Amino acid sequence: MARESRKMEQSGLDFVEVGQHYLFAKTVGETDVVLFAGITGDFSDTHINDQYMKEKSSLGRRIAHGALLVGYMSTVSTISIAHVIHKEGLSDFPVSAGYDRVRFLQPVLLGDTITAHYTVDVVDKERGRSIAKVKVVNQNGETVAIADHIMRWAKKLSMASS
């Protein structure tokens, strides 16, 4: 009698471990800030007006949007799951459930090079989620932003009933 071979389905969380660390680095430039302002509609002088910042700010230069830094946090969270999402036989897939305790600690100036660090802190298989500490540092090693990222491992997406 022929035996039917079946691959056991695994959770993506089986490949996520506390302490795993991922990086994303980028120099924040004019194009990043201008495109982000256009996409979001946030045309604050602090982001787009050189003269205003020279005259009114002790920084003397424009700064990146804080929400742009959250976008870079999202990039590094995507990098963190790249080794998992295309494995065969997964019973679930990752969905960002959000960021807690987001803090902008220092300004990011145009021309700064930031590195987003993503370190898995909690793997909770019972609740189907992982939590990572995210820290963004500039080229001088100064922490400019922090957050906790929650990644939910969903069996299936569904729309909320109305």
Q: Which residues make up each language-model segment?
A:
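HotDog/MaoC-like acyl-thioester-processing domains
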Residues: A2-H21, F104-S162
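Hydrophobic beta-strand-centered segment that forms part of the acyl-chain substrate-binding groove
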Residues: S57-R61, S74-T115
